[in-house]
Amino acid sequence: MKRLLTGLIMLVCFAGSTSYAQGQDNQTDASAVKDTIAKVHAAISSLDISKMEPLWFHNAYVMLVNPKNKSVSIGWDDVKKNWENAFNFWSHIKVTQTAGPYVRVDGNVAWSTGLTNTNAKAKNGTSLNLPTFESDVLRKDSDGEWKLEAHSAWRASQ
């Protein structure tokens, strides 16, 4: 009986430590995803495609919808062109996280939602300040870095 009880206690402790370790891994991954989202916002604010490029997978499956878009950009070439057009349109843009990001990690895939405030000025002088809802899908690459597979942002109702 003592052996059985000792075995059960060891099993529970091992299972608990495994769950704890997995929870810690998810927390570490969630923090890394949040860091990637912050880098995306910094890249947008920099208006510099060279800062955006390393944050994305460069494949035929990535997708992007920005608030001004009327269609979805699919594939890295279209996504890159979308960002270049956006960066050429604005003379200033600042994206500030106001809620979230709320991150869920499942293995090598993560998704994130959040609210941001976008303050921008177009090269033609038009200014805007609006709340934006964002949704992102990320995947961990072979080097353990979280990169975007999809980003969509649209105006939140005011």
Describe these PLM feature segments.
Residues 107-118:
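A short hydrophobic beta-strand element
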Residues 118-122, 138:
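Beta-strand elements of well-folded, non-transmembrane domains
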Residues 1-4:
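Positively charged n-region of N-terminal signal peptides that target proteins for export
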Residues 19-55:
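Short, low-complexity N-terminal intrinsically disordered segments enriched in polar/charged residues
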Residues 129-158:
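Short beta-strand edge/turn micro-motifs at domain boundaries
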Residues 58, 106, 141-142:
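Structural motif
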Residues 28-32, 49-102, 115, 129-130:
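A solvent-exposed, acidic/Ser-Thr-rich amphipathic alpha-helical stretch
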Residues 7-16:
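Bacterial N-terminal signal peptides
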